[in-house]
């Protein structure tokens, strides 16, 4: 899975952002900057599209790694991005006090939703559109918090697999410190995507590509050499988490007239 023409892809995504913003009547956007590669790529795409009308919002919690904030600030300094830090720690600590039995994952999901609230409040205050940062791998696997990091008005990278994001990041001159570190949702201390999912993005993305783009069945995936455990995990996640990327079903009322 190699990007053959990253320059053309950037132009396509920049055009997408400009067209969608114009259609919705917005000139400014806000991006939640985590210090990871996905939000870094989105911020650079927005900068290419609308320049200084981008604002980056850094929203660390009490368990966010120091490295995450440092890397987000590094990106802002290198590309002169308008930004500010708004800690969600007070919201998180209030949640912990209300729910002392909460597990790290539950707290992490709450923090993702606190960030969504913070982004959308800033969006309303400044008349800015919230731009999403979820990649295709995460969306297909349901690896995100519903109404948390999945909430946005536009998503320029939602059709790009994680391994493609890394390639695009290099083309956009994202700092190596961000590209080379282990991907993490930073939901709790020591968390990493690949550790939690149990497989590397290289392996998962190749399987996802074969299944989604090439339409290979479970039997064909196994015949191609994909590990059985990986195939079963990925197909199960796609099936059980599909609802996360769909609007809630609305009951159709019959016999009204």
Swiss-Prot record:
Pathway given for this chain reads: Cofactor biosynthesis; NAD(+) biosynthesis; NAD(+) from deamido-NAD(+) (ammonia route): step 1/1
Reactions this protein catalyses:
deamido-NAD(+) + NH4(+) + ATP = AMP + diphosphate + NAD(+) + H(+)
The positions annotated for binding deamido-NAD(+) are 113
- Annotated EC: 6.3.1.5
> What UniProt keywords apply to this chain's record, in alphabetical order?
ATP-binding, Ligase, Magnesium, Metal-binding, NAD, Nucleotide-binding
Q: Name one GO biological process term.
A: NAD biosynthetic process
Matching Pfam families, A to Z? NAD_synthase (PF02540)
GO MF assignments: ATP binding; glutaminase activity; metal ion binding; NAD+ synthase (glutamine-hydrolyzing) activity; NAD+ synthase activity
Cellular component per GO, a single term:
cytoplasm
* Residues holding ATP: 32-39, 133, 162, 184
Q: Which family does it belong to?
A: Belongs to the NAD synthetase family.
Q: Give the function comment from the record.
A: Catalyzes the ATP-dependent amidation of deamido-NAD to form NAD. Uses ammonia as a nitrogen source.
Q: What is this protein called?
A: NH(3)-dependent NAD(+) synthetase
| Source species of the chain | Wolinella succinogenes (strain ATCC 29543 / DSM 1740 / CCUG 13145 / JCM 31913 / LMG 7466 / NCTC 11488 / FDC 602W)
Q: Which gene encodes it?
A: nadE
